[in-house]
């Protein structure tokens, strides 16, 4: 599978970022995925000055975008689920236990945030999660799990 996101893509294509948030980010110079990955989260929180956009939220967006840029076939909702489970990059994913991670993703899927992100898509199976882990391992082996953040 191909990468679902690249560094040159507009920031609105990042997981969790819709048109309104993209406009807020663009107003502080964050126009692309590369800009998002390079953003200092604390500084971004101050510059954006919106109560719901904290440094932690920005770091979550960065981790989601990084996963979508470095793990082939990683969909936005999958990246959101993984970051909610504490997975921040391909290395974290590659070292994960599929059964444990599948349980975490399922729990998150029951939350309001999870239901918004996942929508009507079927919940990932243990096989799906194992596939994500294998793709992360392969990307690392092939040297593709690095972006110029």
Task: Describe the residue ranges of each PLM region.
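C-terminal extensions
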Residues: 1-149
């Amino acid at each position: 599978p191909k990468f679902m996101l690249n560094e040159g893509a507009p920031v609105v294509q990042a997981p969790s970022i819709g048109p309104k948030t993209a406009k807020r980010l663009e107003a502080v110079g964050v126009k692309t995925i590369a800009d998002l990955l390079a953003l200092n989260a604390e500084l971004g929180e101050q510059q954006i000055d919106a109560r719901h956009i904290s440094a932690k939220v920005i770091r979550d967006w960065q981790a989601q975008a990084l996963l979508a840029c470095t793990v082939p076939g990683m969909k936005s909702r999958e990246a959101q689920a993984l970051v909610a489970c504490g997975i921040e990059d391909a290395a974290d994913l590659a070292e994960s236990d599929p059964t444990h991670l599948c349980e975490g993703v399922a729990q998150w899927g029951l939350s309001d945030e999870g239901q918004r992100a996942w929508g009507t898509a079927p919940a990932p199976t243990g096989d799906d999660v194992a596939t994500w882990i294998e793709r992360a391992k392969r990307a690392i082996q092939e040297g593709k799990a690095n972006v110029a953040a």
